[in-house]
Every structure is written in structure tokens, then in C-alpha cells.
Amino acid sequence: MKCFVGYVTKTGTTMEIAQRVGEALAARGIEADVAAITVDRDLRAYDRLVFGCPINGMKVLPDFATYLGGYAAKAGRPVDLFIVSYMFENGRSMWKKAIRGEAERVKALAGARTAEIFAGRIAGSLPGFARFIFGVPKDLPADIRDWEKIERWANGLADSMLA
């Protein structure tokens, strides 16, 4: 079984999550290639495709959506997605709803089996006005990734690949 774990990243957070997913798959005996997504990669060389992208402004990056619709959906391989959002776990319900909606939109665009949302990391603390708008607690750490959740999800992918 061969899997491509592709990602788009702005700060390295999504790349680090993709690497952890790839490591978890490899530990289960699945050959996992982890790399930034590019249009010149032949996705048909893989049995399974996993793609990740951060949320920015309650949307995935435009190039990611274009890639999913133009390449991933046409590869004829099972697809799973992960979305990274610092706001999702601790923000206001209206932002959670918007992020959930975006995850469902790109899931449909790619014809994906799953679209998981993971907590992310920011480069520093949020300004007070941003904490207020998004409903994020003042003392929230800059890195709130839940590595156990990420590994559970990756192991679930491995289970489905090996079944």
C-alpha cells in the first residue's frame, strides 16, 4: 500500500502534522511519501491520497481548493483531508460553524472520504481585539496541536487501508 500525504503550509504547522501522519502510516507498514503538493506529481502512482491545508480567513488557501478540484478529484484514488485551524477548538461557535462548513466544501470538491479538523499553532499571541472577535482565551498557548488526536486519525486511516 502506497500513500501520498500532501500539504500546503504557510508557517510549517501543516507540514509538521503531515509528517506525523506519514510517520504513523509508515509505522503500520504503509509506504508514505510526505511532500508539498505540486501539479507535476502523478497521483495515480498511489493507492491513497491524504491532503492537508491551513484555514486562513475561515477558508482554505485558494491554490489548495483549485488543486483538489483539478487534480486530486480526477486521480481516481481514495482521498482523505485534514484542515488545520487555531481557532476551531477554542473559538466562538460561529467561527467553528464557518470552519466546519469550509471543511465540508473542500471534502465535496475532492470527493474525499473524510475531512478532519486539527488544532494548530500561531507564531505568537493574538492581539486583544482578535482574541475578542474570535473568542479565544487570553492564556491559550500558541501551539495547541493535539498529537494524540492526529495519530488516532492517522491510525484510523491505516486501519482502512489495511482492511
Locate each region found by the language model.
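N-terminal Rossmann-fold cofactor-binding loop
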Residues: 7, 37
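Short polar catalytic/cofactor-binding loops
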Residues: 8-12
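Hydrophobic ligand-binding cavity/cleft-lining segments
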Residues: 20
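Short amphipathic alpha-helix with an adjacent loop that forms part of the alpha/beta core around
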Residues: 38-44
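FMN-binding flavodoxin-like domain, especially the glycine-rich phosphate-binding loop
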Residues: 13-16, 24, 28-33, 45-163
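Extreme N-terminal starter segment of soluble prokaryotic enzymes
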Residues: 1-4
